[in-house]
Amino acid sequence: MSNLATVTPIKPHLEVVEHRVAELDDGYTRTANTLLEAVMLSGLTQHQLLIVMAVWRKTYGYNKKIDWIGNEQFAELTGMAPTKCSTAKNELIRMGVLTQVGRQVGMNKNISEWKTKVNGFGKTFTRSVKLTFTKSVKTNLPNQSNTKDNIQKTINTNTPLPPKGGCDEGSKPEKRKPTKINYSEYLAAYNEIVGDRLPHAVEVNSERQRKLKKLIDSLATKNIDGFRAYVKAFMAAARPFHFGDNDRDWVANFDYLLRPKVLIAIREGTL
């Protein structure tokens, strides 16, 4: 007689899956709609937007206006590295979106103080160039109709005569005298704009004169006004790294702004 085999049924492994559902009973954050809409229109970067939301969570989420929030807390809430959290937070403070009192930060509800797109400070490069280009093209384009007639009318059939009292050959245009640069004025303008945030420039040596002259020739407005605009643009675009927030204790200075690549970075928005 054959032995009967015992068959044990195999049951599938059942794992309990928890479905997480957001509920107001678990807590909520009250935010003014005007503030929310202003943030959405401000053109903030992803890192900056995450920091704003983290500040809301740690302040408005606990019915506070301001609180101390460490970089580690920001990192836990946003998933970013603490150093990136610090950089984005400092950028928002400089832009006036966040306020800082000591080590505490909070949201600046006075939207008119923000230096962002919502106030017109951040008009995009593409749009501004497009408007300028369109206007200049409409102004400067010649009338293209009746091209054949226009060409014939512009042909001068008269024999050109030499100017009275002068010679028609060998005359050369008078050379323009180069504008003398007051280098001390440029250093003073730089020191005034950077204030106490960057080291001041004192000495006007030959190397600085040479580099400054080259920089001025590269500016759109080749005078002290163009230089002041350049320094102001740098201060607005500079990151905490440029003000000493780095491992080397390095800070930007007057000679750093004389570098051609810094001017290019300011123009292209890649500083």
Swiss-Prot record:
Coiled coil residues, start to end: none
Gene3D superfamilies: Winged helix-like DNA-binding domain superfamily/Winged helix DNA-binding domain
Key words, A-Z: DNA replication, Early protein
Compositional bias of kind Polar residues: 141-159
Name of protein: DNA replication protein gp18
Gene transcribed to yield this protein: 18
Top-rank lineage group of the source organism: Viruses
GO biological process entries: DNA replication
Record flagged with keyword rRNA processing: no
Residue numbers spanned by region Disordered: 141-178
Entry's family note: Belongs to the phage O protein family.
